Amino acid sequence: DIDLLFVEAAVNDHGNYFCAIDQVRGMEGIVRHALLANPSTDIVMLHFIHTLFLEMYPKGRVPDVILNHERVANYYLIPSVHLAHEVSDRIAAGEFDWEQFGGIHPAEPGHKIYAASLAHLLDKMWSRVSVSDAVEAHSVPEPPLDVNSYYNASFADISQVKLSKGWEQ
């Protein structure tokens, strides 16, 4: 069973031009599927940085993809970490630049920044619990945020695939 799941899709959902509906459906699919499989799984949503986000945060704007994923986080009462905002602020403050960070797929310095932020989060969260505390199941809200989200997705053997018109093996 999974005890702790970190989920991040802001960079790819934005970079692959998924619409707002699909951003919510995809993120809810991951979160809901995980909680239905094991209601005791703790989930933390992460928001990594994309080049275009660097222009938004200094203007006080939050990228739509992050707002869409936050709808899911709020609905399922899971915490999120806005690493994109932190990185943008630190670049604006001159602590490092985009090249030093390593870009969308961070170099070692960028990974260290993400790791330090997550270590801080875990230290904070662990300070609130004791090893003797019982693991509690999370409630899964009904109905889903989007009834067409992808939480019922599954893998299928290729032999089960039926090709629609215009496709061939």
Annotate the PLM regions.
Residues K112-Q169:
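Conserved catalytic region of serine esterases and O-acyltransferases that act on ester linkages
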Residues I2-A134:
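Alpha-helical cap/lid subdomain in secreted, periplasmic
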